[in-house]
């Protein structure tokens, strides 16, 4: 296949023709964008759409079939905050039916929400609120109930607080792990712009810029990839896999706002879903992120504007 790819790339023909030939050969769209359009994923998508319209639809093989972004994935969330004692917050959360316990600092997954201590936080009555395993839209509805209580009792966040999201990674192949790490690395500059400055490269959520694409692509095991990225204090934490069979995303700023949480959880879900097929090309702009719909692109465009003001 490599020889066929090379022969297509050297043809004296249009980019559109090369894109269509490579697609029919089974080359992933992100790779086509890298090879033909200098990473312009949108150009590739448009070229293939025109081809489908002209030919009345393509018989697309499984490797390039449309991805299903329905949100039914397992996930977990950790909310760092302050300004309410753990005992009081637990009482108030039980009222709307949230099962919760006050515990000492631990990393054990529970079947209930837990309120634990966290020595990295600043403020009065600091705490970390950790969810049990949540699933899809039902999990988001439970999270929304929790956020109502946090808002009602004036729970606050500051720059020492973060929002950590765990996404189920059981069964990931090494191709998915590599695609995921590369995609986040390639989108890091875009993501940084819709995060506060305090979450762009602090000690507890360091970036991936120190890891070259080749170091990621050549990793043969999760442990090897984990050692190349570094310890758990990175925007993408692979250490969570050995303990919880999850991948942890640590970059989001502390918040009690459900809209922010929901959008970030869905962003990560779609990022992971996309990584099951391919990687996001380097230097992809926000408007060209292939897994976001127009509503989410608008949301993050507005977040970017607000944080740049």
PLM features: residue spans?
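Eukaryotic N-terminal low-complexity, Ser/Thr- and Lys/Arg-rich leader segments
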Residues: 8-11, 41
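Short, amphipathic alpha-helical "recognition" segments used to contact nucleic acids or chromatin
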Residues: 10-27
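Helix-turn-helix DNA-binding helix
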Residues: 19, 41-45
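A general structural motif at alpha-helix termini
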Residues: 36-37, 48
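Short, Lys/Arg-enriched N-terminal segment that forms or immediately precedes the first helix
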Residues: 1-8
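Short, charged amphipathic recognition helices of the HTH superfamily
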Residues: 25-35, 161-164
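C-terminal accessory/tail domains of diverse enzymes
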Residues: 30-31, 42, 49-156, 170-309
């Amino acid at each position: 296949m490599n020889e066929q790819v090379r022969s297509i790339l050297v043809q004296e023909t249009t980019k559109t023709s090369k894109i269509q030939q490579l697609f029919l050969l089974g080359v992933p769209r992100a790779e086509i964008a890298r090879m033909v359009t200098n990473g312009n994923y949108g150009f590739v998508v448009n070229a293939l759409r025109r081809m489908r319209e002209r030919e009345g639809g393509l018989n697309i093989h499984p490797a390039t079939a449309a991805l299903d972004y329905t949100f039914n994935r397992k996930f977990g969330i950790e909310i760092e905050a302050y300004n309410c004692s753990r005992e009081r917050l637990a009482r108030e959360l039980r009222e709307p039916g949230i099962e919760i316990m006050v515990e000492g600092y631990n990393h054990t997954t529970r079947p209930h929400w837990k309120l634990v201590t966290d020595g990295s936080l600043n403020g009065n009555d600091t705490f970390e609120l950790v969810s049990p395993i949540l699933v899809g839209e039902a999990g988001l509805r439970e999270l929304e109930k929790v956020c109502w209580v946090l808002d009602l009792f004036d729970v606050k966040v500051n720059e020492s607080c973060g929002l950590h999201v765990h996404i189920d990674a059981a069964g990931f192949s090494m191709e998915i792990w590599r695609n995921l790490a590369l995609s986040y690395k390639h989108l890091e500059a875009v993501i940084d712009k819709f995060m506060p400055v305090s979450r762009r490269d602090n000690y507890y959520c360091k970036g991936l810029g120190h890891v070259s694409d080749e170091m990621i692509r050549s990793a043969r095991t999760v442990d090897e990839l984990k050692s190349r990225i570094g310890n758990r204090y990175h925007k993408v934490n692979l250490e969570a896999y050995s303990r919880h069979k999850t991948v942890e995303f640590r970059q989001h700023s502390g918040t009690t706002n459900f809209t922010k949480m929901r959008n970030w959880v869905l962003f990560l879900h779609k990022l992971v879903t996309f990584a099951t097929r391919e990687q996001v090309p380097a230097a992809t702009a926000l408007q060209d992120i292939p897994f976001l719909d127009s509503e989410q692109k608008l949301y993050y465009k507005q977040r970017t504007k607000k944080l740049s003001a």
